[in-house]
From Swiss-Prot:
Pfam families: HTH_49, Resolvase. PROSITE patterns: RECOMBINASES_3 (PS51736). The keyword DNA-binding applies. InterPro entries: Cry35Ab1_HTH, Homeodomain-like_sf, Resolv_N, Resolvase-like_N_sf. It comes from Bacillus subtilis (strain 168). Residues 83-102 bind DNA. This is Resolvase homolog YefC.
Length: 111
């Protein structure tokens, strides 16, 4: 009886080294394709960034959710209200308020 591709028991009847060698071969092929695809993604991303940087209005990174005016308004509200109250009023998270307050204090010192 010859081994068939449609017979799963045919693979199990092969000696162990052949199965191991086939697994290594398949793993190597899939690894090479994965590495190739990753390299292609990196290359396309870098090309896209270079094209985007030609635009004078391009800013790298995540866009700001709140304007400076909104942050400053929230910081003035902090003078009379708690962080939680200001968060409820403005929708600006406590962590963002703390970060903005530290940044404002550092700017005042470095001035």
């Amino acid at each position: 009886m010859t081994p068939s591709l449609y017979n799963p028991l045919a693979i199990a009847s092969k000696p162990f080294p052949a199965i191991y060698s086939e697994k290594i071969l398949i793993f190597t092929i899939f690894s090479a394709f994965a590495e190739f695809e990753r390299d292609m993604i990196v290359e396309r991303t870098q090309e896209g960034k270079m094209l985007a940087k030609q635009n004078p209005d391009f800013r790298e990174g995540r866009p700001k959710k709140f304007t400076k005016q909104q942050i400053n308004h929230a910081l003035t509200l902090l003078e009379n209200h708690s962080y939680k109250q200001v968060e409820d009023m403005t929708g600006i998270s406590v962590s963002t308020l703390v970060r903005a307050k530290k940044k404002k204090a550092a700017e005042a010192i470095n001035g």
